[in-house]
């Protein structure tokens, strides 16, 4: 990889970006010249149908040493993704301790574990959710034909070398990789763990702000896209793809991360969650958690998300005469939560970094007994919730846990008991 410029970034969200690792590698005034500069091949990378509205269209022109078409047939791999098939649908509330870190050499692909999904990979909607754990860098290259990937590291820094450049991503940052983009995950620390949402629907975008105005939440300038960086390596390289949930591999005689220049908007990017401009009440009551939305994948129903990525970052709590934790709730949406660091303000214990929970459609949830008792009796001074970062993958379709998720020892069998300590405080003689 030509690393001289690899860790520079371009700022913005949804921009028409352009980058070249060699001067003059980008054609001027056209996309597909008869002879591309430096003897490169021209290739179009489409993330949406040609006839999408211009505001929705995602595509990038690449100028590369070898075209992607130069590969032998793919063969289904003997080792498939961990986690197995989906299990039985359950309305019960589920919570998991962190999955064990691998002890055998495990790269990012082998470390992916299926946790839940609500759609087949052949459908243009829905999501799949994975945990990952790894202790070695990938030596092969991977692409996912089934959807866009949202990576949420919880432990360990990652260097993600892609066709369009390099992203360094640490805990408290996220990365989004377009469907089909080739990449290699390298570990910058001895071990890595985190979460992945696979988006089978419309590409993620910033949510509309409505009456919030033209600024706030995740601001476009804080999203970073890499600059062009390429490998000119003539050596055996394994290329793995995920296609309809199955892993397939082929052997190349060159590195597929060989794009010297590119322009377009179908690009990878990263975002530092600490840059999120948190909105909250300065009077009373607890606003809806939609104010914490970082990115959204919409459905055809206006306002109904295929996937919302929501965070619960450090913030001040100043509401007067208010029960400040998230309220008790029954929800149309389905909520898969994770914790990157610290504690979640609705759960005093049991929900730890690297863990997860699933509350399905209309599953009652809310603060546990200890949190509730403290909040009812708290002295309502301004207080800061600090050193925390919880997040949620929220989706409008019911998530079905994998068989692994339902059978693994990390599933907390006593999760329901956290609400059993809620006291009966009703007294019809006292208002």
Curated annotation (Swiss-Prot):
Its EC number is 1.13.11.5. One of its GO terms (molecular function) is homogentisate 1,2-dioxygenase activity. The active site is at 286 (proton acceptor). Its cofactor is Fe cation. Pathway: Amino-acid degradation; L-phenylalanine degradation; acetoacetate and fumarate from L-phenylalanine: step 4/6. Keywords: Dioxygenase, Iron, Metal-binding, Oxidoreductase, Phenylalanine catabolism, Tyrosine catabolism. GO terms for cellular component: cytoplasm. Fe cation binds at residues 329, 335, 365. The keyword Oxidoreductase applies. InterPro entries: HgmA_C (IPR046451), HgmA_N (IPR046452), Homogentis_dOase (IPR005708), Homogentis_dOase_bac (IPR022950), RmlC-like_jellyroll (IPR014710), RmlC_Cupin_sf (IPR011051). It catalyses: homogentisate + O2 = 4-maleylacetoacetate + H(+). Homogentisate binds at residues 344, 365. GO terms for biological process: L-phenylalanine catabolic process; tyrosine catabolic process. Hexamer; dimer of trimers. Belongs to the homogentisate dioxygenase family. Involved in the catabolism of homogentisate (2,5-dihydroxyphenylacetate or 2,5-OH-PhAc), a central intermediate in the degradation of phenylalanine and tyrosine. Catalyzes the oxidative ring cleavage of the aromatic ring of homogentisate to yield maleylacetoacetate. This is Homogentisate 1,2-dioxygenase. It comes from Pseudomonas fluorescens (strain Pf0-1).
